[in-house]
């Protein structure tokens, strides 16, 4: 019997990969990886490893979750060391829990290797601390995508005014609903907000607005996935603490000279 390692690849910058994740990738016989995994990380796999792309776009899956689960079980039963490589952290909106359940039910040994989630890392690369003693004593990590419409409606009632900082994953498609539900349930429309596109990578772009202009900003700035939404007064710290995109601009300028 082999073993499956459910591994977080981090938010995009390959240098944010953990040492334990790197060791697992180097030893793996089979690696099943998602779309948001930086392909540079795959260079650490051994030459004879099987690399299987499971890429998932919003509303379109190259490989269905049930198929991925079957592959994990099949390769482990063949005695392989399997790495299931997922962007960010596998247990933060990454279906890692579902995959671990499947392995447990089938008697497959497994291990979880956490990764740095984009909700913290992308915000940090945009100069936004998700908590701050003067602006945010609590934070909620939220998915903007729900299996059931009624779940979407109900959750936002609690989130609108009870949480200082909202970090929203997969929220672009439903941004109009998010804006509407926050405003309907008492969130101040002037609350600062940020979109962080391709956070921690050389394609990172941060766009700033307010809660009452979320949906129009998506259209105006042509914001697409993968993008993180951060809402709360902590967003204003960007103007003091921004560092990464300034470095990218300096690099672009030096290369142009």
UniProtKB/Swiss-Prot annotation:
InterPro entries reported in the protein's UniProt record: 4pyrrol_Mease, 4pyrrol_Methylase_sf, 4pyrrole_Mease_sub1, 4pyrrole_Mease_sub2, CobA/CysG_C, Siro_Cobalamin_biosynth, Uropor_MeTrfase_CS
Organism domain of life: Bacteria
Keyword Membrane: no
CDD domains per UniProt: SUMT (cd11642)
The keyword Glycoprotein belongs to this UniProt entry's keyword annotation: no
Enzyme class: transferase
Biological role stated in the UniProt entry: It is a step in the biosynthesis of both cobalamin (vitamin B12) and siroheme.
Similarity section: Belongs to the precorrin methyltransferase family.
Protein name: Uroporphyrinogen-III C-methyltransferase
Organism: Bacillus subtilis (strain 168)
